[in-house]
Curated annotation (Swiss-Prot):
Residues 1-22 form the signal peptide. GO terms for molecular function: porin activity; structural molecule activity. It is found in: Cell outer membrane. Belongs to the chlamydial porin (CP) (TC 1.B.2) family. One of its GO terms (biological process) is regulation of cell shape. In elementary bodies (EBs, the infectious stage, which is able to survive outside the host cell) provides the structural integrity of the outer envelope through disulfide cross-links with the small cysteine-rich protein and the large cysteine-rich periplasmic protein. It has been described in publications as the Sarkosyl-insoluble COMC (Chlamydia outer membrane complex), and serves as the functional equivalent of peptidoglycan. The keyword ATP-binding does not apply. This is Major outer membrane porin, serovar B. Part of a disulfide cross-linked outer membrane complex (COMC) composed of the major outer membrane porin (MOMP), the small cysteine-rich protein (OmcA) and the large cysteine-rich periplasmic protein (OmcB). It comes from Chlamydia trachomatis. It comes from the Bacteria. InterPro entries: Major_OMP_Chlamydia (IPR000604). One of its GO terms (cellular component) is cell outer membrane.
Length: 394
């Protein structure tokens, strides 16, 4: 049985290096791996000894914490209906644009994100009690990247309007088309990130250790760049701003430098995780395998961001959106000339959450002189991620 356990853990730890958010599982035996310090010797006394004090029981560790998520499995968390203009029904020619909101099927409902990445570098600190329990925290910085179908971001615009561009700008009309054949991606800046947690070695038998941990992490980075890759309305915004809690139609100045009532787009990231893991010590190597249950959310307050445009018309247009049918003829005196151009385009950053809650983690810890340790871990199923942890005991 011991040989089988050794084989399974060693295989899992070694195979993890060949496979490849932001919370690692960690080695369940970590509280008891470093039993000596670089400044003070460890104390292996009996907790029930009346001569033992809490000073003897407590020790500190510090080190580097790096967590790199290459693909977090996320989906949108939105309502089934979305308020926008009625769907066009005219088969030929142009039509009068809708001016009232209608409840339509939300194209963002249940959408899966194509890619979600997060990279964290931090300092970690742990308070150890009796070489069995850890209370720890991390302080550092995170940055991220999100990519998904434009329907996940409710990219909408006005199409087929019988009015010219100047009249559309009066804010009387609402978008009637959902653009779902394109891609939206965003990059965040590097922002402060922190996490707290606790880990305990629950059961030990020889060299095997069964442990559990609980962690919580939070960060709120701003959106650094937003790219909309759409043939009908392609644009890029650096440090985008938008409207929070405002329904369509947007203000007349939306997307211009004169826009008011906007705020910086930021993403509020929260995650909590519970895990159970088993390790087996083999001299200086301690491989482990664990399961985890976590929930993560990315909330941008459903901020709506308008396509950048000119405050004044240039050649009777305010954007460089192409004509779909190639028949656009810009004339101020003639209506319907821009009916085949996408107008008043905007999108919103919807709330996202974990699509899968359960995952597995495999890794190994290398301990040197019972004072220093380096842990390497990879996580699968609910995310593809790698973790590196290097620490020492005082």
């Amino acid at each position: 049985m011991k040989k089988l356990l050794k084989s399974v853990l060693v295989f899992a730890a070694l195979s993890s290096a060949s496979s490849l958010q932001a919370l690692p599982v960690g080695n369940p035996a970590e509280p008891s791996l470093m039993i000596d310090g670089i400044l003070w010797e460890g104390f292996g006394g009996d907790p029930c000894d009346p001569c033992t004090t809490w000073v003897d029981a407590i020790s500190m560790r510090m080190g580097y914490y790096g967590d790199f998520v290459f693909d977090r499995v996320l989906k949108t968390d939105v309502n089934k209906e979305f308020q926008m203009g009625a769907k066009p029904t005219t088969t030929t020619g142009n039509a009068v644009a809708p001016s009232t909101l209608t409840a339509r099927e939300n194209p963002a409902y249940g959408r899966h994100m194509q890619d979600a990445e997060m990279f964290t570098n931090a300092a970690c600190m742990a308070l150890n009690i009796w070489d069995r329990f850890d209370v720890f925290c991390t302080l550092g910085a995170s940055s991220g990247y999100l990519k998904g179908n434009s329907a996940s971001f409710n990219l909408v615009g006005l199409f087929g309007n019988n009015e010219n561009q100047t009249k559309v700008s009066n804010g009387a009309f609402v978008p009637n088309m959902s653009l779902d054949q394109s891609v939206v991606e965003l990059y965040t800046d590097t922002a402060f990130a922190w996490s707290v947690g606790a880990r305990a070695a629950l059961w030990e038998c020889g060299c095997a250790t069964l442990g559990a941990s609980f962690q919580y992490a939070q960060s709120k980075p701003k959106v650094e760049e937003l790219n909309v890759l759409c043939n009908a309305a392609e644009f890029t915004i650096n440090k985008p701003k938008g409207y929070v809690g405002k329904e369509l139609p947007l203000d007349l100045t939306a997307g211009t430098d004169a826009a008011t009532g906007t705020k910086d787009a930021s993403i509020d990231y929260h995650e909590w995780q519970a895990s159970l893991a088993l390790s087996y010590r083999l001299n200086m190597f301690t491989p482990y395998i664990g399961v985890k249950w976590s929930r993560a959310s990315f909330d941008a307050d459903t901020i709506r961001i308008a396509q950048p445009k000119s405050a004044e018309t240039i050649f009777d247009v305010t954007t460089l959106n192409p004509t779909i049918a190639g028949a656009g003829d810009v004339k101020t005196s003639a209506e319907g000339q821009l009916g085949d151009t996408m107008q008043i385009v905007s999108l919103q950053l919807n709330k996202m959450k974990s699509r899968k809650s359960c995952g597995i983690a495999v890794g190994t810890t290398i301990v040197d002189a019972d004072k220093y340790a380096v842990t390497v871990e990879t996580r699968l199923i609910d995310e593809r991620a790698a973790h590196v942890n290097a620490q020492f005991r005082f």
